[in-house]
Regions:
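Alpha-helical transmembrane-bundle signature of multi-pass membrane transport and export proteins
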Residues: 2-444, 449-454
């Protein structure tokens, strides 16, 4: 890890203020409310589905390598189609892209659930279905970020992003805990079915988003022209591409550790799916704590504060390497969750103030593409690396890489010196619809590779 005047809350008269009528904040308009509700529903399903997918592979007789292949099958099309998704999202109404992507994810998860509930699915079937889910996410993410950025006005950006992510991550806490418990009690198939239903419900909400306030682009050019324009915007900003390079490594190693090694450590050393679900829930609790902090804290040096908070993302890999008892793993997951949320809000605020709205989905697509580019390889080779050097050494290596690349990106002057601009000079004009509406989506959260979600 992003409205029409008709959906704006409108002015508050002195008389209505005296009557004390309950009102939402002026920036929490219709689009913001719909997107927040849809994100909550999606995260309730998806966090449990991440656990269920790994355990479905193991239940079908799969190995660590098979778990990695299924994870890679999801992330590979996600990476391949992100740039096209970003270009399309800047050309047609973004909510149409979001609804279509949700429909694809709903169908793929429903079929996956059916196969798991009616028998042992084949590895190729699980890979195909997760690949379809990844394809939907590739088109969804840039459109969702663009919609979010167009829905929040500059003066309220920091608080709006923090509140949005707090609601989304709060749902993730419940989803991870409930998903882990459901896998243990009912099996992974029912959790995948719940995820399919969540995509259907969220897509229905997103169908009502209003994009009438967003100016239509002038005709001319094609997808390749759009991609070139996005690339020029992306490469012209050293702070942007350097942090994307950093996260290409961070997301890869943390994603491999938590998507492949984490469930196996839980199964062999911690007691199964339920304790792992609790640990992921504590990551979510940490993100809520970080979001609460960012509701009131506005660091002047946005990227310096955010980047320093990437170092704690090494802790979960180290905790799995030891391995820590469940309570210790929950503690390090909480700390890393709070830290990544500080980064996430700082990153979203920086993007909001620096990137033109009409370019945002394309620039966001390059961000996602770079950040996720190494994740398919990392998850695919996690099994062979474990066989070659052992799981403990692999996990310590993941932790070390997070520390090294984060220290390296602090050498970039723009990362150290990027400052928060006066709020009156950034963000969409509040009189052109900025108040009307608000995924996951700053950097992809390592514990939530579906991004909204590392």
């Amino acid at each position: 890890m992003s409205s029409s005047p008709a959906s704006s809350p409108g002015p508050v008269s002195p008389a209505s203020s005296r009557r004390g009528s309950p009102r939402r904040p002026e920036w929490a308009g219709r689009n913001y409310t719909l997107l927040t509700g849809a994100a909550v529903i999606t995260n309730l399903g998806s966090h449990g589905a991440l656990i269920a997918t790994a355990f479905a592979v193991v239940q079908a007789g799969g190995s660590a390598g098979d778990v990695g292949l299924v994870a890679a099958a999801r992330t590979l099309p996600l990476v391949l189609f992100l740039l096209i998704g970003g270009a399309i999202a800047d050309r047609i109404p973004r909510h149409h892209v979001m609804v279509a992507a949700n429909a694809l994810n709903c169908v793929s998860q429903a079929v996956f659930a059916f196969l798991v509930l009616t028998g042992d699915p084949q590895l190729w079937q699980m890979m195909l279905l997760t690949a379809l889910c990844g394809t939907g996410t590739a088109f969804f993410n840039p459109a969702a970020e663009g919609m979010l950025m167009a829905s929040v006005s500059g003066p309220h950006a920091n608080r709006a992003f923090a509140l949005f992510r707090m609601a989304m991550n709060g749902a993730g806490v419940g989803g991870a805990a409930l998903g882990g418990a459901m896998v243990a009690l009912l099996g992974p198939g029912w959790v995948l079915a719940v995820d399919a239903a969540a995509f259907a419900a969220a897509g229905a909400l997103r169908a009502f988003l209003d994009v009438g306030h967003i100016a239509e682009r002038a005709p001319g050019g094609g997808l390749l022209t759009d991609l070139r324009e996005g690339w020029v915007e992306f490469r012209s900003r050293p702070w942007l591409w350097s942090i994307v390079l950093q996260f290409s490594v961070v997301v890869a190693v943390v994603g491999a550790a938590e998507a492949v090694y984490g469930p196996l450590v839980a199964l062999e050393r911690l007691g199964g799916a339920a304790p792992w679900g609790v640990a992921l829930a504590f990551f979510g609790l940490g993100t809520i704590g970080g979001a609460v902090l960012m509701m009131v804290w506005k660091p002047r040096r946005l990227l310096l504060a955010g980047t320093l908070c990437v170092f704690p993302l090494a802790l979960p890999s180290a905790g799995l390497a030891v391995p820590l008892p469940v309570w210790g793993l929950c503690l390090v997951m909480f700390v890393s969750g709070a830290a990544i949320e500080v980064f996430g809000v700082s990153w979203m605020t920086t993007m909001h103030q620096e990137i033109p709205e009409e370019m945002f989905s394309r620039v966001s697509a390059y961000d996602w593409f770079g950040s996720l580019s190494m994740l398919p390889l990392a998850t695919a080779v996690a099994g062979p690396v474990e066989s070659a050097i052992g799981r403990t050494s692999a996990l310590w290596g993941c932790a070390a890489l997070v520390v090294v690349v984060t220290a390296a990106v602090l050498l970039v002057p723009d990362v150290r010196h990027m400052t928060r601009k006066p709020s009156a000079t950034i963000g969409p004009d509040t009189e052109s619809g900025g108040n009307a509406g608000a995924l996951d989506l700053a950097k992809p959260s390592p514990a939530d590779p579906s991004p909204a979600a590392v």
